[in-house]
Structures are given as structure tokens and as C-alpha cells.
């Protein structure tokens, strides 16, 4: 077991004081893994038993079809968690691959120890369960937004829908998106070159302005 982190800013631990981290993690159990960019944290069809919490770096949730085409469903970043969708169900088998998108350090905790009170009836278990329910609800919302984007027929419609969601989320028409061109193309499920051409057209037509991953809706 690795040294217990004193503070992890994950929403799973919302409402838990820094001094409570050590006894809490000692109770539920944990381990910390280090990964390099391109590593696989969990393969599709692998049974998931632990929740992963990203302490540094990021991980992509990726779906691959029979022809090897990969679609990035969502990027999980620092302090966010992954795997909870699968460990919560009756079937723990993952339907996606978790791919490390940059060097990462990940805290793993066993799901069953998070969701069930221990024999000592530690006070933080109820808080963990509340936080987990809230996290799953937020993840479902994010996936619904992704579905709204990719269901659009044209690249322009997908781009405008995605940028509109980002503007609403960040409460500004001037905002930064978390993707470069390659990642954005994967997220939108479109060809990168075609996406680049469409962005140029939209800028020339006065719909948007952008510099790298900084966008402004005009």
C-alpha cells in the first residue's frame, strides 16, 4: 500500500476533512498506480472492481469497433473518477477501454468498501454514498450532452452544438475547450482534416473566432 495522500480534491470526498482522509482510506483500502501516456488502465470486457480517482494527468474513455476505429467518449481529468458506472451494476464488465492520455497517477479504491458501512460504522460512509450518487447523476448528464452533439448530422451542426454547450457551461461566449484538434475530432466523431476545414469556414463566415483551443462565439 502506498503512502496515504492527506488531501484529494475528488468530488467523491466532498465534505470530508483533510484530517479524515487517512482513517477513511485506511478503512476502505486503496492503492496508487502510476501510468505513462498510452498505457491502458482497463481494457474493454475487463471486470472492474475499483473506482479510479485521477490525482494527476488524464484518462480517456475510448470505444473501439471491429475495424479498429476508436471513438473518445469522454476525457477524465485531475480529481475526477472513472469506473463507477461498471462497478455499480450487476455486470462489472467494462464496455470501454480506459486509455491514459498523459502521464498520470491514479488512486484506486474498492467500490464495495465505499458503498457499504464497515463494522466500525465509520461516519464518512454515508457521505461517500451521497457523493457517489451525485457523481453518477452528473456523469449521466455529461453523456447526454455528448449524445446531443454526436446526433447532429453535419460537422458544422456538431461543432455549433458543442460550442454552445461549452458557452452555457462556462457562462461566457469566450471560453477554452479541453481538447486539441485531434481530440476534438475524436469527441465529435468526425475526420480531423474535415473538422479543420469547417472551423476555417465558420471563422471566415463570422460565426466564430478561435486561437488553438480558445473560442469565441460571435
Per-region residue spans from a language model:
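Short, small/polar residue-rich loop motifs at catalytic or cofactor-binding pockets
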Residues: 27-28, 46-48
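Phosphate-/nucleic-acid-contacting segments
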Residues: 153-155, 162-218
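Cyclic-nucleotide recognition modules
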Residues: 72-130
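Cyclic nucleotide-binding regulatory module and flanking cytosolic helices
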Residues: 1-37, 86-90
